[in-house]
């Protein structure tokens, strides 16, 4: 059995025998599923990016309806969702990135840009195409897993590399819409702090 799957984590075995997705280092996870395999993830209350590299999955969270997502797409699962369930409709490769509850480039966006690009009602699983630089980046992550490289500090640096790549190779509108759950939460937090300390 793969060492990643044997490793203890905050996840627990599902009673219905669906495949439980391991979270080896709490930053990146990688797994392959055969077609028609059910799976579930009990994740931390942080934002996660799911990358569908190959295949097709039907996915749902505690706060949304089922949606089919295809290969070479990525999407954000917000921190309000603690459980993700799905079915692999084809043989599927998935990478998960625990992105945390803040993004370093939030300050680069004006309030006007955020209001014009964000939806009032954020669509769960609004997919974004995985472009070639991100695909190459993910291939490197997969190689680390295949060779059992599990340095948490390195994966932390790779997380920031992903944030750099998405800024470099995607339009500002795409980036804001993709990260809108995080940006909105950070904006609300900033308002609360400002109101408390300016009275």
Residue ranges and their predicted role:
Residues 46, 127-131, 152:
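Amphipathic, non-membrane alpha-helical segments in soluble helical-bundle scaffolds
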Residues 1-22, 147-150:
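A short, N-terminal "cap"/entry segment at the start of jelly-roll beta-barrel domains
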Residues 109-136:
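Aromatic/histidine-rich interaction motifs
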């Amino acid at each position: 059995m793969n060492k990643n799957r044997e490793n203890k984590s905050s996840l627990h075995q599902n009673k219905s025998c669906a495949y439980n997705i391991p979270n080896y280092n709490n930053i990146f996870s990688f797994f392959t599923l055969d077609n028609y395999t059910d799976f579930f993830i009990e994740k931390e209350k942080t934002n996660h990016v799911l990358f569908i590299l190959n295949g097709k999955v039907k996915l749902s969270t505690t706060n949304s309806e089922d949606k089919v997502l295809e290969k070479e797409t990525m999407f954000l699962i917000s921190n309000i969702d603690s459980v993700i369930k799905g079915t692999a409709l084809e043989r599927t490769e998935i990478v998960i990135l625990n992105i945390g509850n803040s993004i370093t480039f939030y300050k680069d966006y004006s309030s006007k840009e955020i209001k014009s690009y964000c939806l009032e009602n954020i669509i769960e699983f609004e997919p974004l195409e995985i472009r070639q630089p991100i695909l190459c980046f993910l291939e490197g992550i997969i190689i680390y897993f295949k060779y059992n490289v599990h340095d948490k500090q390195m994966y932390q640096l790779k997380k920031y590399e992903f944030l750099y790549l998405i800024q470099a190779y995607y339009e500002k509108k795409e980036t804001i819409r993709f990260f809108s759950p995080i940006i909105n939460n950070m904006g609300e937090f900033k308002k609360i702090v400002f109101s408390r300390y300016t009275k």
